[in-house]
Structures are given as C-alpha cells and as structure tokens.
C-alpha cells in the first residue's frame, strides 16, 4: 500500500521534493495536512501522527515536531530530493519534564518546558547549550527565535533577549556584539506585551493595546519606521491610522501585521513579491495589501521570503513571495507578487470548510517551507500566544470566594503575580480601542476604581496587595522605558486605595515619587500631559496623596539623609503637579500649601541652608543632601512666607551685630584709632522736617548700614524704640510722601490708587530712596499705607500687568477699554473713532509711530489695548520705576521676595485693614485690677464700639503706632489693659505702643471714658 501510494504520487508528479505541488492529504475525517513543497515520506509520517501533533515548527532545512504529552521533540532534516523520509532525531528534556513548545533559528533550537523553563540546543549536535540561571528563576510563557538570537517573554511581563547583536536585534543597545546571557529589554519594561516575533536579524513585540515595537536590522525597512537605519532599542511603529494590531509575523527581511478588522499590512524586503503589493520594491512603512481588502484575513505566517494569509470566510489560503522551492503551493516555482489562492493541484484551489466550527486551520511557515494543518479544535494544538495574567471582575469574585478553600494558595499566587508586575496590572485595565479612536491613555480607570474598591473590602487582600506593591511592583516601575503605555502604571497606581492610606506613605508613596523623579524629561512630560486631563476631584486627590506624605514625614522629621531624600522626592512630585495646575488653573493655590510648615519647620535652619546654597555653585555634599523647603514656594502659605522673610531679616541683623562686636573687640585689643562699627542703623528726625531729615541721612549711610537693626528717635521726644516708634515713623513718613500735594505720585481720576508720574517733578534719586524706604519698612517687619495697585507688586515679581490692573488704577479708563474689546459691531470705527495715541497724566503720546493717524478697528483693537496698558505701566514710567525697584531690592532679598504671589506681596508690604473689632475685644488681656466684667472695661468697650471706622483707626495709631495690620495679626489683634493704682480719673489714657498696652485709669462714668477716648484719638502722635 505504501509503495503503491508512492508510485501513484510519482505518476501524478506530486511527490518530488523540488516540485511545487503539495502531497494530497489522505481522506481523514479527523485531520488534513498539506506540505509545500511536498515531501511524500515526511507527509506520510506526519499524517499518521497528526491527531496527536501539538506543534510543527519550520526553519531552513529542518522541521521540528512536538506531540501531545510533550515527551520530546522530533527534528526532521528537509534535504532537497530526500522526500523527508529520514529517521528524525529526538530531543528530550530531563526526567518527568514535559515540553510546551519549541522554536528554531538558523543554528539553534529553543524548547520551553511545561513549567515555563527554556532550554537551548545546538541544531547540529543537538547538545544542550546552558545559559545562566536568570531565566530558570522566571516562568516563561512565549519564546521565539531569529537566525542567531532568541527572545523570551516571562509571565511577569519581562522580555529577555540573547544571542547575536550585530544589528541591535536584542533591543538592549550596542553594549556587546553577542551574549549567551539573557538580558532584560529595559526599553519595554512595564509594557503589557501580547506577542513576540523574530526574523532573520530583527525583532518585534506586540502590546496588549495593539501597538507594535520593532528593532534590529533594517536595511530593507523591515522595522516599518520609515527609514533603513538599524535600531538597537525598540521603536514604536506609526502610520497605521489607529488600527489595532492583533498579530505580528517576521520573515527573513520582511514583516507582516494583522489588525483586529482583518486587514493585512506588510513592509520590508519586496524583492520576491513577499509584500503582496504587485511589486518587488521595498516598503519602509506598513502598507496595506490591497488585493485582500474586502476580505477578513484571520491568520498570517511568514517564511524567509514568502507570506501566507488565511481568509476563513472563503476557506482559502493566499500565498505570495518567493516560490523557489514550491513553498507557495501555486503548482510551480515562480515568484508571486500578489496574493493568490494556494492550490492542491495545478487546477484545483485549496478550499476548506469555512462554515464548520469544529475544525481550525493551523498555518506554519518557516525557511522555504509552508505547512497547512486542518484539525479538530479539540486536538489542542499548542497555544503559542499565552498571555500574562490579568485581573477582571470574574477574577475578583473568585478571589473573594476562595478564602480558606483548596484554591486559596493558588489565589494568593495569582494576587502576587498580578500586583507584583507593572505590565500585568496595567494589562488588567486596558480599554477596548475602536479603529477610529484616538486615545492617549488606553486605561479604563473607572473599571480599575471599581475593582480596587471591591478588593479592599477584604482586609487580607488589602494587606497582601500592599505587601506586593511595597516589595515588588514599586521596585520594578519602568522609569527607563520611553513608550507611553509603559508609563500607564503611573496613572493607575494613584487610583489604588492602598496608596492613600496614611500608614503607607513611606512604603508606597515615597518610592513612587522617587521613581517619577528619576524619569527622563520626555517621560515626565507624558505624565504631566496626562495629569492635565484629569477631572478636578481626581487631580485634587493626587495632590493630597503627596501632600499628606510630606506632612507625615514632617511628623517624624529628624534631618536624616533618608528623610531629606524622601521629602525631596515628594516635593519634586508636588512641583510637577503644581506646574500642571498653573497651566490648567483647576485647583486653588491653597490646595498645595502645607500649613503645618509654620510650626514644624525650623526657619532658622532653612534660611541658613539658603545662604549656603547661594554662596557656592558647587554646593557641599552636606548642603546638597538637605532639602531646602523654600525652593518649593507653593507649599508655603502666606504666614510661612512672612515667617521666612522675618527670619531672614533677623539673621541679617544679628550677623551685622556680631560683625560690629568683633570689630569693636579687635579695636579695643589692638588700641587702634579706627572708629568702631555701629551695630544699629540710627535715624534721628524732626517731625516737622521728616522727609528732609530722612533723605539727608539716607544719602550719608553706607549700604552695609541699611541692613542693620533700625533705631528711630524723634527730636525732642522721649521714646525708646522697641517697635512702636518705628511703626509711627513709617506711618508718618509715608503719609507725607504719598500725599497728592507733595507731588511725588499721580492719582488718576482722583482714585484711591497712586502711580508713578510720566513727568516727575523730583529727580530720579528720590524714587530710589522711596524704594529704599519701602524695603526698609519691610526689612524691619513693618507695614505701610502705600496705595499702589496690584500692578506694582506684579512688576516687582517680573509679571506683566493686565487690563484688570488698569481697572484698579483707573476704573473709568479700564471700563472704557473693556467696552471696546467687548464690542463686535460692524460700525466699530464710527462708534469709537479712536487712534493709536493716548492722553495720560496730562501728556499725549503715540503708541506706535504715526499712531495719531492710524484708526483702531476690530482687527487691531486688542493690540491697541495691549499697547495702552504697556504704556501706562511700563513705557511711560520706566526710568522712575527702575529707580524705585533698584532701591527696594537694595534692602530686600529678591530671591525671598519672589516666593510671594503679587497679592501676598501686597499684603506683606502694605498690610491689611480687614478689622474684626469683635475679635479685638475677645482677644483683650487684662492685668491685675481689671477683667472683662470690670465696670470701667465694660464702659470702655461700649464707648469704643460707638466710634466711627476712622476714629477706631486713629485709636489703633495711638495704641500701636499704625492703623494697618500685618497678615499674622489679622486674627490676633490684641490689646492689654493695665490699671495704674496711683492714677485717678483726671489722668488721661496712655499707651505703650511697642507692646499694645493701654494704661486705662479706673474711670467711673461713661462720659469720662468717652472724653478720655476722644482725647487719645485726637492726640495720637508723639512720645514722651
């Protein structure tokens, strides 16, 4: 029978190995097998065992066969003219070891055991080639071989590569030309991979999101990147019009992609027509195989120079490319430039029963060989696309139900596998992508939130997940991996409730922040772009996660290097989020502020570190390892910034005192004739010549004197300056200098705000001194009534004033310009009839050359308004403003001033008048002899609350030296009542302004109290 079958085959011309036709399959109801080119002996041998065949694998000159049970691999030599009838060699693993799958290269074979261990063999000697045990510690789920390199995908989602690397086909850079030690492809770390494939010297990986990465040899464009330069790191293939790819196949120097919609794309070498484009040209990018458009391709395979495609609806296999050995099944050995159906004879096309659901086609191509296997699905052909473990709703329900059952240990292993792997966790929550959908993020975060919420209902699962995140996943976060989908684990983790448990801040949140801080700028930008898409509530929750961690760290702050590193990472993380918020303006600044800093931060240490950091470019290692909180000003509320400013002032003053002391000691010791340095900056002024005296003395002092402690005395008055005299000094001085009658500033429209004049009546130096005085007031922790608009404080911080600032300075003008901007009428020019010239501060000027003849219209009106604002706030006052700024920053540290926002800076310089008189009464303190219910005190408060606002402000001047409050005093307005026993009702009320102490005689009548209070208000100046 066997001999007759062979003869019959010869007569029909279908058995010779070099011929094109396939061996006719036996009429088996169970399975059918076709070989192209035909090899009668091999065909018969395979067909007899087809029902138990688990895998067939081709490579140039060899066919490997794996049967059910996985006891061993049979390797057949495919030699021309042999018919493939030689006795195959058999490879077996160790005792009791089963084989799952096999793949072959040009000279090596890779065998994967059922328990996920890979073994490599030499194809000639069949000897086991041992490599280091790194893969023996992993469970491998997929393997693939190039000619001289291998890839392996682990269950944890890690991709390993080893072998030849002359063209970068390992994807690990060009560190070595080859290696026998498997290397992790770091570039794809964290990417949930679905499939891997290898060609002659190039490699490809398909992610679960449908993205394809390629690397290695590229002389024919087989990487699909649009050029022919080889790549030693995986690169994303683009230009697929958002098609989701479901399968990739690598030929020798060409590649093929199959999408979820059944479209076939090919690229790379086209010399033999293996791309199917009716051309022999190479393609550098994925190109659709037009001949198959309209059909749904369901399976593809690539040989060395040919390609196969199966259209299940038709029951036909199409082939194209090299037909040198008859591998196309076209009845000959000619090349085929476009897809044509495979034939089983010269006149009969292969036609499978496409309607059946019981059978499936297995299509194998390798070298110059094609194999078609039509078998029952129940035959259990090897699954070559085993995927990494992922999580879904069904898995969660099973986990919860498995507690203390026989499956419990298995369940715990599953939890550990998924929550220890960034790729597995990310792959669990991928969104389905439609072909027309553009999605920067492929995650279904709502699904993730729901599953996490369900999981955390069980404490044992919560604890186990926390342990997995801490011990494994966070240590494997892919900060080196540039693909965006590798970074999606960073989007996912903050959704995990364990990250928001306060006890986990050090074990989970800090490591997360440290990894993000190690990212490249490109990867960091991807994260920030994602954060910018978050809803307000989600974004706020993310900010709070890191802010809470900072607060928790401050609770245990001991200045150790580790804690400095922790806080540095957390603050850098908040800095990134704050940068995103500045663009989005989604959350108020207060969300980022850590109020606890005010009481937990050592401000003296903080200021000293700032000095050390500024003193040298190459800061000492000790300074570098210490976090400087004020480098992250967004975490400081205004009170903390003020405290930092005042601490800086105090240290400067103490430094000057110490320097003066050392100088005095040296002079005394050496009996030198030099003058000793004064430890203070002393001003003696006359009330009726206040401005004159101040300016004269300022011009005589050295710059170094200005930053000493200020002591002020008024001529002819007795008053030791412990703060109160300074307050009154600045109050009176600025009150005179800002008066419209004095002429130093202009008040547009008689408004309450003042601005610099276009043509000042004083020399520029006076504005310099005014800036010095403003800085001197701030340096000495004082507030002053300076009715500048917010625009001034913006300019001090190098920010541009806006139309809103002009509305504050000149309400009428601002309103008119707004009306101009809002008007969209067609008769705009007739209604407004204005030109690019302006009248401001009694001066006319052109905003642009020849502006008086250029009409403002709908097209240029925004430019007109912009130039108008710029003229008022910048161009018209440039000279005098620059002098003011120079004087101000001569006194104040610009770096610290720029920690403030404009509104905050205005509050700290100008103070506040948001009085709360009820709180003022509530905060009152009483020395012995008085209490809140004492008749005199009751009468005093009754009389006080009857006063007008202006009278109350005058009383504050009498009590404190100023009518303005610092930010820190808004809720702490205090007055201390003292009862001098020797005083009687004829004595007036007196005040110790430095300490807000009121000496109040025990008046017995309401009339006496009111008279005494009025006398104090009307005589609220002077000391002694």
Curated annotation (Swiss-Prot):
The record's active-site residues are 994
Q: What PROSITE patterns would the database entry show?
A: HECT (PS50237), RCC1_2 (PS00626), RCC1_3 (PS50012)
* Compartment(s) of residence: Cytoplasm, Perinuclear region; Cytoplasm
Report biased composition (Basic residues) as residue ranges. 1-13
- Where the record annotates domain HECT, the positions are 702-1024
Gene3D superfamilies for the chain: Hect, E3 ligase catalytic domain, Hect, E3 ligase catalytic domains, Regulator of chromosome condensation 1/beta-lactamase-inhibitor protein II
- Quote any Pfam family the record assigns: WD40_RLD
Q: Name one GO biological process term.
A: ISG15-protein conjugation
Mapped RCC1 repeat ranges: 96-155, 156-208, 209-260, 262-312, 314-364
Q: What does the record give as EC number? A: 2.3.2.-
Q: What is its main location?
A: cytoplasm
Q: Which InterPro entries match?
A: HECT_dom, Hect_E3_ubiquitin_ligase, RCC1/BLIP-II, Reg_chr_condens, Ub-ligase/GTPase-reg
Q: What induces it?
A: By IFNB1/IFN-beta. In endothelial cells, by TNF, IL1B/interleukin-1B and by bacterial lipopolysaccharides (LPS), hardly induced in other cells of the vascular wall such as primary smooth muscle cells and fibroblasts. By viral infection.
Post-translation changes: ISGylated.
Q: What does the record note on quaternary structure? A: (Microbial infection) Interacts with human cytomegalovirus protein UL26; this interaction inhibits global protein ISGylation.
This protein's name = E3 ISG15--protein ligase HERC5
Q: Which organism is it from?
A: Homo sapiens (Human)
Gene designation per UniProt:
HERC5
